[in-house]
A protein has these predicted regions:
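Tandem repeat scaffolds
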Residues: 1-134
Length: 134
């Protein structure tokens, strides 16, 4: 499924299954993606914060495995405790984003795990990476 140039304001995607969906040039203002299934979802040239806002969208505890964000504005977004294994973040504005306790690992046994993320050309100024395993 594909969505193009749609604007969502104060919309709750919480607990929804949005896996494999593609959003292109969409705007998400003060939206809630908490605990949403965004596995293999693709966001291209999307905006997740309105100019002047001090808080972005919430992705807390979301399943972002193999999700792709390309040329997106994700400043001040909250990714705390999200499953980010295999996430792709390319040319995104992530200023002040909160990744505290985000999980970029795939644990295969008690002592062994693999980490995976593709982060290129992103602005991570002031991003919180506290207790992240990457």
């Amino acid at each position: 499924m594909e969505t193009y140039r749609h604007t969502y304001r104060h919309h709750s995607f919480s607990h929804q299954d949005l896996s494999d969906i593609t959003f292109t040039a969409c705007t998400f203002i003060r939206c809630d993606f908490r605990r949403a299934n965004l596995r293999d979802a693709t966001f291209i040239n999307c905006k997740f914060i309105e100019q002047g806002d001090i808080e972005g969208c919430h992705f807390d505890v979301a399943d972002l495995r193999d999700a792709s964000f390309q040329q997106c504005q994700l400043a001040m977004a909250n990714f705390s405790n999200a499953n980010c294994y295999g996430i792709e973040l390319r040319e995104c504005d992530l200023k002040g984003a909160n990744f505290s306790r985000a999980n970029f690992a795939n644990q295969v046994s008690n002592r062994m795990y693999f980490c995976s993320a593709f982060i290129t050309g992103c602005n991570l100024s002031y991003a919180n990476m506290e207790r992240v395993c990457l």
